[in-house]
Structures are given as structure tokens and as C-alpha cells.
Amino acid sequence: MRLILLGPPGAGKGTQANFIKEKFGIPQISTGDMLRAAVKAGTPLGVEAKKVMDAGGLVSDDIIIGLVKDRLKEDDCKSGYMFDGFPRTIPQADAMKEAGVPIDFVLEIDVPDSEIIERMSGRRAHLASGRTYHVKYNPPKVAGKDDLTGEDLVQRDDDREETVAKRLEVYHSQTKPLVEYYSKWAASGEPGTPKVRKISGLGAVDEITSRAFAALK
């Protein structure tokens, strides 16, 4: 099982990724984790990436694809792997294709923007303990106060409505086109094309998991 998981921020990809990993016994490939590991280990690509990062630049797709290819050679990838958060752009998808990285499925978790904004902008946190609440789905006993300490809850900057709206804008302009990219490739009938599946990310967590497993058959 070799798959790419797509969906907007706040769609519940992380939760579903954990269930998929467990069911199929495959690792989740995170480019951020790979970069940090390569830099720490001082690999040739890690050294190259560190130079770029230290200068405040963005690590090139070539370096990222190199890291991906190295990562996929490791033993835990023998029965498959799952990409979450990569590729993010068409050039990255092209680079993966040219590098011959095999993909069986592209699974999109679809959630309307209005729902994403409600989910994310409703989050509240008690910073000292890490406890989290939601004004609608998991409210504190007293509005705006932590249940245990009575201290104020805060809305993280990342969860502010305008920040969420900006992240969604980036997703729709850069990452959402990947769905069409992979759909066109699948329709071409070329050998090695992935199957593209779309499921709703609305409803209870176990319902969404059932949809995901059914889509990956």
C-alpha cells in the first residue's frame, strides 16, 4: 500500500493517517521529519539542506525528492508507505513521477471550507497544561476558562479565522490542483498510474475511517 493523503488543513488527515498506518503496517513519510533527521545525521543531502535553511531559503524540490528516495530504501517501507503533506505542488508531483516513486492510491479527505473554519477557529487552549477545548464540540464547563485551574483559555494565532482562511487559500491554489493532476494521470491509462479516491471528512471519526478503508480496496 503506497499512498498520498490529501486534504485541507483541519480535515482530520493526521487522525486518519494513524488508523491507515496501523491497518496496513506502513510508515508515514513526513518531509519535515526527513529533513530534520538528514540535517542531524549530517548526510550529504542534509548538509546541503542545512546551508539553504541557515540562509533562510526554501529547500529545493530536488533535495526533498533525494531525501524521499533515500527514505523509501529503508526496510520499513518494503510493504508500502504513506505521504501526508507531500507533494504540495504540481512541480513536486512531477518530480516524484520523474523519480519513479510508485504510488497506488491518492486519497482526498474532502471537508467544506466553512466547516474547516468552524473546526479550527473554535479551538481554545490552556497553554500551561496543553489541555485543549472547542467552543462547540468540547466546551469548557465555564466559557473561556480551564476546567481544572479556572485560568483563561486562549485562541492560538494559527487558529484565528483570518489565519485559517489564508491557509485554505494556499491549499486551494497550490495543493488542491494535485487532485486534478492525479485524476488526469489515472485517466491516461499509463502503466503505474495511481487510483484516485475522494471521501467526505464529515461525521464521526470511525465513520470517516470506514470510508477511508473502503476507498483503499
From Swiss-Prot:
Gene3D superfamilies assigned to the protein according to its UniProt record, in alphabetical order: P-loop containing nucleotide triphosphate hydrolases
Record-listed E.C. numbers: 2.7.4.3
What GO MF terms are annotated? adenylate kinase activity; ATP binding
Where are the stretches annotated LID? 122-159
Q: Write out the GO cellular component annotations.
A: cytoplasm
Q: Name one Pfam family in it.
A: ADK
**Catalytically driven reaction(s):** AMP + ATP = 2 ADP
**Residues holding ATP:** 10-15, 123, 132-133, 203
Please give the residue ranges the record annotates as the region NMP: 30-59
Gene Ontology annotations of biological process type: AMP salvage
Leading EC class = transferase
Q: Where in the cell is it found?
A: Cytoplasm
Q: Which CDD domains match?
A: ADK
Which pathway does it serve? Purine metabolism; AMP biosynthesis via salvage pathway; AMP from ADP: step 1/1
Q: Which UniProt keywords apply?
A: ATP-binding, Cytoplasm, Kinase, Nucleotide biosynthesis, Nucleotide-binding, Transferase
What does this protein's UniProt record list under function? Catalyzes the reversible transfer of the terminal phosphate group between ATP and AMP. Plays an important role in cellular energy homeostasis and in adenine nucleotide metabolism.
**Record note on domains:** Consists of three domains, a large central CORE domain and two small peripheral domains, NMPbind and LID, which undergo movements during catalysis. The LID domain closes over the site of phosphoryl transfer upon ATP binding. Assembling and dissambling the active center during each catalytic cycle provides an effective means to prevent ATP hydrolysis.
Per the record, the similarity remark reads: Belongs to the adenylate kinase family.
**Sorted alphabetically, which HAMAP family does this protein's record hold?**
Adenylate_kinase_Adk (MF_00235)
Q: What is this protein called?
A: Adenylate kinase
- Origin organism is Aromatoleum aromaticum (strain DSM 19018 / LMG 30748 / EbN1)
Q: Which gene encodes it?
A: adk
